[in-house]
C-alpha cells in the first residue's frame, strides 16, 4: 500500500521548497562544470557500474547530476524538479528531466528504481516529512536499491548553527549519528555516512590551503568533542548518506536493538 501524503501545498517549506534545487550559482551554465566535478568526486563511486541502471534524481534543478550521469554513459536517468524554468534549462541541453513534485511523483509512479539520488538538502523538510519521504523512497526502490541523500552537518562548530538559522526553510540539521539513526528507523541497511568534500578544484592553489586548514580544524574539533564525551568524527559543512533498501522488511518499522547508547548523544 502506498504511503498517503499531504498534497504539495500542505508541505511546510514555502520559500525554497524541498522538491526544487536551490544551490545553483548565478551563472547556471558554469554550474555544470563545478557541480559536475563536486558530484563526480563525492558520489560517482557509489553509483552502480551498470549503465542501464534506472536512476531517479529528485530536485534536479537544471540537471547538474543528470548531466554528469549522462556524460558517463548512464542511459536510464530521470530528473524531476517542481520549477518549470529550471527543468526547461535542463531539457534545452537534451537532459531527461520533467516537472514534478517529489512526494506526488513517488506516490504515483509504479516502476521501481535502482538508485534514488536526492540533489537538494533534506533539511528543507520537517522531521515528519522526512519520515514520509524516506518511506516513499523505500517503496520506489528495488530490493537492494541505493538511496543517496545529503544534509547540513549540525556537528560543525563553525557552520552548524548558522546553517540552520540562515534559511527560513531549514528545519533541522543532522550529524553522522542522527542521519544513520533515521535511516535505520526506516529499515535501510548498509548505511554509510560520508563527509562531502568541498575542496575538489585541484587546479586552484587555494584549494590546497583550504584542505590543510580543514584537516587542522578537524583535529581540534575532535579533541574538544572528546573532552565532553562526544565521539563525532565528521565536521565537514555537509554530510551525505548512502544506504540500501533491505529485503524482507517493512519501511518505517524499527527492529529491536537498533537503539543503543554509544556515547554519541
Predicted regions and their residues:
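A short His-aromatic
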Residues: 123-125
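Short glycine-dipeptide loop
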Residues: 141-147
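Conserved N-terminal segment of class I S-adenosyl-L-methionine
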Residues: 1-119, 128-135, 236-239, 248-265
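Short, glycine-/aromatic-enriched active-site segment of Class I SAM-dependent methyltransferases
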Residues: 149-172
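Short alpha-helix
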Residues: 171-187
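A C-terminal cap/extension of S-adenosyl-L-methionine-dependent methyltransferases
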Residues: 97, 148, 181, 192-265
Amino acid at each position: 500500500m502506498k504511503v498517503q501524503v499531504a498534497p504539495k501545498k500542505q508541505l511546510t517549506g514555502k520559500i525554497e521548497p524541498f522538491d526544487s534545487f536551490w544551490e545553483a550559482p548565478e551563472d547556471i551554465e558554469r554550474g555544470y562544470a563545478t557541480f559536475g566535478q563536486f558530484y563526480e568526486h563525492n558520489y560517482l563511486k557509489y553509483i552502480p557500474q551498470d549503465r542501464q541502471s534506472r536512476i531517479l534524481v529528485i530536485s534536479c534543478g537544471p540537471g547538474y547530476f543528470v548531466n554528469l550521469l549522462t556524460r558517463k554513459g548512464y542511459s536510464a536517468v530521470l530528473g524531476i524538479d517542481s520549477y518549470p524554468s529550471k527543468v526547461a534549462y535542463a531539457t534545452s541541453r537534451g537532459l531527461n528531466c520533467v516537472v514534478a513534485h517529489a512526494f506526488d511523483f513517488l506516490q504515483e509512479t509504479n516502476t521501481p528504481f535502482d538508485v534514488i539520488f536526492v540533489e537538494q538538502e533534506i533539511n528543507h523538510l520537517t522531521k515528519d516529512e522526512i519520515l514520509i519521504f524516506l518511506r516513499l523512497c523505500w517503496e520506489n526502490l528495488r530490493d537492494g536499491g541505493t538511496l543517496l541523500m545529503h544534509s547540513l552537518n549540525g556537528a560543525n562548530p563553525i557552520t552548524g548553527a548558522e546553517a540552520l538559522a540562515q534559511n527560513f526553510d531549514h528545519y533541522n540539521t543532522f550529524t553522522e549519528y542522527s542521519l544513520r539513526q533515521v535511516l535505520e528507523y526506516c529499515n535501510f541497511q548498509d548505511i554509510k555516512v560520508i563527509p562531502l568534500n568541498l575542496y575538489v578544484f585541484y587546479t586552484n592553489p587555494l584549494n590546497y590551503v583550504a584542505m590543510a586548514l580543514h584537516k587542522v580544524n578537524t583535529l581540534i574539533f575532535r579533541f574538544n568533542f572528546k573532552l565532553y564525551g562526544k565521539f563525532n568524527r565528521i565536521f565537514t559543512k555537509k554530510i551525505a548518506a548512502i544506504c540500501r533498501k533491505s529485503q524482507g522488511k517493512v519501511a518505517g518499522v524499527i527492529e529491536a536493538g537498533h537503539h543503543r547508547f554509544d556515547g554519541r548523544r
